[in-house]
Amino acid sequence: MKNIAEFKGAEKLASKLLEIFSNLSGNGKSFDPMIEGVHQVVVIKAEERLSAKGKEMKEIKVRSTNDGRDATFYIMKFRKQDWKTWEKIEVGQQLTITLKYNNGFPNVTINQKGEVIDNLPEKPNKPLTNQTIYIYDIEVFKKDNLYVFRDYFTKEWTVIHNDLDALRKFYLANRDSLFIGYNSHSYDSNVMRAHMQGKNPYHVSKAIIDSDDRGLVYKMFDTKKTPLFGMDLYQDNRGFSLKEHSAFLGINIKETEVDFDMDRELINWREVMKEHNLSEEMDELTLTDELARVTGINVDIVYKLVMGNALVDEKTLNEIYCKNDVLATELRFEQNIGMLVAKATIALYFGLDKTALSMTNANLTAELLGAVKQEERGDELDKYELPEGFDIESDEIKKAFMSGEFEQNEKGNASIALEVNRRDVTEVLGVGGIHGAKESFIYVGDFNARDVGSLYPNTMTLFNYESRNIPEDKKHVFQMLLDERMKAKYSDKETINVRGVEIPTKLLINGFKLPLNTTYGAMGAAFNKLYDPRMRLLVCITGQMALFDLLEKIEPYATIIQSNTDAHYYIPFSDEDAKKIDELAKDWEKRTGYTLDNDPFKAIFQKDVNNYLAVTADGKVKFKGAIGLTNGLKVSKAVVSNAFINYVVAGKDYKDFINECDELRQFQIISKTGWTFDDTVVRDVDGNEHKAQKVNRVFAIKDPSNAVEIFKVKRGSIMEEEGTTIVGDDSYTKGVPNAPEYYLIDNDTIGEGTITLDKLDKDYYINQVEDLLVMWFGTNWKERIENAHSQMEEFPEVKNYID
């Protein structure tokens, strides 16, 4: 594991992303509003619907055949003359129109009608400006603003500080580029676009930060102007802040010393002092008075800066901080590049335009499937009917799921929680699917996993459980995605041509998987166009009924190890029983319509249904749960996970693994103070406290003289939480769970700070592994694991499974 994460092949994939992006329809100019005048257009949307006030209307959208610009307007039915003019206008109608604007609203007159065509014009994708990928970030103060852009390929920086003209020139020279940010769709993009339109960036920034009303933000500038093509790395990866990702990746996570709430322009105090012959050697009060006089800043504010040794170059510090965030975003971009290419690929496959890339995966999926938002149907709790062909024997299951309407839980959704005690495991059925497992279980020998292929997507198509918000003429799309994914999966081609772009087959498969795996969740999201809680419930229940049906058929011939949403792991009693299960599985496939994979394994070490290590027949290691650190994303105490995995499945002594490890990033422990707390403080060995940042990188150390302790503070509140002490009226909660006895903070880039390998307390990390072993396998863990190792003919490779 490198001190700073590296992602080989990222630049090649970024080039492919840019190629796909450039082939999506649209350029910056084509998304500008259609200008007043006479235009040759084609109608690309003609939809009758109700207005927000319930009035009958028709939404018309036309596209210029010259430059691809669009105009959208609404014809109200009660305006009889207008309605008569537009009532029979349909999609594909060619028109010559005159466009005028009245208070910003388009007024369209038809000059001439042409033929109706089938092939609607796409927006031109030829770039009219420089086209590249920019990584960017912005910092906005009340009287200061900073924009930092970095060309991903040339690594050239563009820094724009308090210069609106320069920002507009940069935009006009690069508007056909792809802009990558972190939380940029909600924040950076809106602030930048509003600023270019002459709005106050600070006011827009505050509205975004302080208000939950998105509509308020969009009223502050014209969302139809200054289009910015972008992808937001935060959008579909909620849960971790950019600072946390920076910490996991090993780079500098120091927060800026500049106060974002300051009510003045940023100042280079060193320059001011030099210009006016002032020195920090002067008497503090005299220096304060002089600086206040020459800058015009309130004397109390200046005094705090003088006393706090904060007379720094604020502009440079802010630029350094912003550049550091851009570099962090760039590294996260490289880490996530595969998903971004998959997203762009599916947009290209469906012929969407460049703005589709700024959508969340859920909204993009709704767009692909043509979903139209509907009123709630109120049928979620209706009685469930088991599909034909299913064979459930359990009366307990029938009573819980098929006897009548469902009860409503506290969130207003159907309550479907049930525990069923079986011979080997207790099966838990609920909104998360079927789950059950033998706890603290170790087995060495041949066993199988029967895994249902694409359980939820196939449930939707087999039983017509797709969202009812998908129009009839789009119902085939979901099945087509399933079919095309399977076709690509079994293709022997390295690349497949999609609209003139050669896409690596693996990336195309991931592109198809994106909407397939997103649809189920979107059907339960109230603000998504696919929202259909009844169909989502039917998918959830039917998937569990299918798995329970299969469970009942396997049980007489095998020991069940675990059930996990779409699979059963089991040990056949004999070779004959294994053959019998194969026969029953084929019958199950025929009855239900699903397909089953049969994956062979040769060892499993299982804490519970959500935490296990398994060795496949070909010696690969499959792991699930916290030990995997969010699939290697959350690099915190990685050496503990790696030592644990290598000891349990590969027989490598965990003490030796840790003592031999010379990779500092494996030893980092990342702590974060959540939003429910007011402050983070650090206490040194002498009991002195000072304010600390929310995200910190700490290491266990041997020397107590350098140790500190982090606390999360709730002001004026008494909290009853483990690890919490009361200090006056405040609650102090330990900021590092399972903390070392002694630790220090080092928020510099790993390898450039104060921590070195010789300072580490490696015994702490060894003890953490032993705590995990007890948690998984009990106090006799050593005997159990050594017994398992004695039965293993060969071990998997010793390596960093978290890397």
Q: PLM features: residue spans?
A:
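Structural detector for short beta-strands of small beta-barrel domains
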Residues: I35-A52, I133
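OB-fold (S1/OB) nucleic-acid-binding surfaces
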Residues: S51-F78
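Short nucleic-acid-contacting surface segments enriched for D/E, G, S/T with interspersed K/R
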Residues: K80-T98
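OB-fold/S1-family single-stranded nucleic acid-binding modules
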Residues: K100-P121
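Conserved "right-hand" nucleotidyltransferase catalytic core of DNA-directed polymerases
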Residues: N125-K126, E139, A247-E257, M262-N458, ...
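Conserved DEDDh/DEDDy metal-dependent 3′-5′ exonuclease domain
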Residues: F149-E244, D259-D261, D289-V294
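Catalytic nucleotidyl-transfer cores of nucleotide-processing enzymes
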Residues: I180-Y182, S189-N190, D391-K529, Q791-E794
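C-terminal, non-catalytic extensions of nucleic-acid polymerases
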Residues: I509, A578-D803
